[in-house]
């Protein structure tokens, strides 16, 4: 398969939740980023929910691009793995999301981290506007104690206009 063919193939499944919400689930990070770029062009960028589950690039690099050779210690219990994952998220994933949306000034100021025995979760939230449409971007990144796979949940919601209270004169 040529490089051109790989770029054209978007690996995605659409899953419907019990509430009727449709979530797009991607098999790799490149397909996810390609989809975000396409949604920005298609005017559907302010109401998107998708997920991607992938091995971080630094993990694949250490295993020479072979998922079978990934060390069992590459998980949320390993401080080095968690540190590298956080750097990957801050310096690459969030930056790629900004670029895909076409909003380089997007700042994820509302951040939180939750850590327990089973997983580590980072949550990022940021309000933004594209083509005069305001919306909130929510990104949740989760790593688990039993695998090097990372789960990313990406959600955008239109901002509700402020309800103005009517004053009675």
Swiss-Prot record:
Bilayer topology term: Peripheral membrane protein
Organism (species): Eremothecium gossypii (strain ATCC 10895 / CBS 109.51 / FGSC 9923 / NRRL Y-1056) (Yeast)
Family: Belongs to the RGI1 family.
One GO CC term, this protein: plasma membrane
Role according to the record: Involved in the control of energetic metabolism and significantly contribute to cell fitness, especially under respiratory growth conditions.
Record-given protein name: Respiratory growth induced protein 1
Domain of life: Eukaryota
Keywords: Cell membrane, Membrane
Claim: Membrane is one of the keywords in the record: yes
Record-linked Gene3D superfamilies: Respiratory growth induced protein 1 (3.40.1000.40)
Swiss-Prot/TrEMBL GO biological process terms: energy reserve metabolic process
Predominant localisation class: membrane
Location of the protein in the cell: Cell membrane
């Amino acid at each position: 398969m040529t490089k051109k063919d790989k770029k054209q193939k978007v690996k995605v499944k659409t899953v419907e939740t019990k509430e009727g919400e449709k979530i797009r689930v991607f098999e790799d990070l490149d397909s996810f980023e390609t989809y975000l770029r396409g949604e920005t062009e298609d005017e559907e960028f302010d109401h998107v929910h998708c997920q991607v589950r992938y091995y971080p690039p630094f993990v694949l690099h250490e295993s020479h691009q072979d998922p079978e050779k990934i060390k069992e210690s590459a998980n949320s219990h390993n401080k080095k793995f968690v540190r590298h994952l956080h750097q990957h998220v801050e310096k690459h994933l969030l930056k790629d999301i900004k670029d895909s949306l076409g909003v380089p000034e997007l700042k994820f100021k509302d951040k939180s981290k939750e850590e327990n025995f089973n997983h580590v979760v980072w949550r990022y939230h940021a309000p933004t506007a594209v083509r005069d449409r305001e919306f909130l971007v929510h990104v949740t990144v989760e790593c688990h104690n039993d695998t090097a796979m990372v789960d990313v949940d990406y959600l955008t919601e239109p901002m509700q206009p402020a309800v103005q209270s009517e004053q009675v004169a």
